[in-house]
């Protein structure tokens, strides 16, 4: 497969603050790439560099196997993007807003606007004023604008941010359909891991400006294991009891005191009985399987991604 995006040792520094630190990622043709991290991790800064909105402090970007800086105009013609909240004229309809954008982009294709509105499911809402759109409809209109010029690469920055579960489901389905039916390569940033893991082929996890891991999602799933999750009153005593009574050493203790026990899954009741007999308060005990959320927590060494 051809590499659509190649980023090598990319850094963006503002004074003494390093927003993105020596980042390297690769996105192959046809992939949906999940660029994941907490708010403020460096996702949007990276995307702005990819789109030429800000200049890197150092590093190299290749898109469509061409150096970005020296081929910027040509490359950007084949990229569609939605960065943060899409901006439109509130007192114009969806169709009127897209007509203005089509003129700016120099799009001559007669039915381009109708086509993208149909793709994003807004054909029946094209004469509704933008100010009367729901947040989910506004996000879909932003994606429609990004598709107007039939790009090869689509970059979406937090497209499900602030949406209700129905809106998230609609955007997720739309992204899947775009990748499959139009063979578009998609880079999507998010902090909502449960939604992203249903979409992506490859994952890049960024934290405090540093890429912690880049992995194919299928390989990540193979790493997932079942574990017993226990919340208790005395972590040190529990660790001692697990080691001396059951020979359990394959466990982790999270910052919030939760135990993750990766062995002896079938002995959950015996473990619970041992703890209670030793005056340990057991607030919660359940068997869970690792997913992208728990994988992220383990990588960054603490709380959830929000």
Question: Where are the language model's segments positioned?
Answer:
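ABC transporter nucleotide-binding domains
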Residues: 5, 12-188, 193-207, 211-213
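Non-catalytic surface loops within mature trypsin-like serine protease
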Residues: 29, 106, 124, 234, ...
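ABC transporter nucleotide-binding domain
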Residues: 172-262
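Short, charged/small-residue-rich alpha-helical element at the C-terminal edge
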Residues: 226-299, 306
């Amino acid at each position: 497969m051809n590499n659509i995006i190649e980023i090598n040792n990319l850094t963006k520094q503002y004074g003494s603050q390093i927003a993105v630190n020596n980042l390297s990622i690769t996105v192959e043709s046809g992939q949906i790439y999940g660029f994941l991290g907490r708010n403020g991790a460096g996702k949007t800064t990276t995307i702005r560099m990819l789109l030429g909105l800000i200049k890197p402090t150092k590093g190299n970007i290749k898109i469509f196997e061409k150096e970005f800086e020296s081929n910027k105009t040509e490359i950007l013609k084949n990229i569609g993007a939605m960065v943060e909240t899409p901006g439109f004229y509130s007192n114009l309809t969806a169709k009127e807003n897209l007509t203005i954008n089509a003129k700016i982009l120099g799009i001559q294709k007669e039915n381009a606007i109708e086509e993208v509105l149909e793709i994003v499911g807004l054909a029946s809402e094209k004469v509704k004023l933008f100010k009367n759109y729901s947040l989910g409809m506004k996000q879909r209109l932003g994606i429609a604008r990004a598709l107007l010029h039939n790009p090869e690469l689509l970059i979406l920055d937090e497209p499900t941010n602030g949406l209700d579960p129905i809106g998230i489901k609609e955007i997720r389905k739309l992204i899947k359909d775009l990748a499959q039916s139009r063979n578009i390569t998609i880079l999507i940033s998010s902090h909502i891991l449960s939604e992203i893991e249903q979409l992506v082929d490859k994952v890049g996890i960024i934290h405090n400006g540093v890429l912690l891991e880049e992995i194919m999602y299928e390989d990540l799933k193979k790493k997932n294991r079942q574990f017993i999750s226990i919340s208790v009153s005395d972590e040190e005593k529990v660790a001692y009891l697990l080691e001396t009574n059951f020979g359990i050493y394959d466990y982790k203790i999270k910052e919030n005191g939760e135990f993750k026990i990766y062995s002896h899954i079938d002995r959950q009741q015996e473990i619970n009985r041992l703890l209670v007999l030793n005056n340990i308060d057991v607030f919660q005990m359940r068997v869970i399987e690792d997913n992208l959320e728990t994988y992220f927590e383990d990588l960054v060494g603490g709380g959830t991604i929000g």
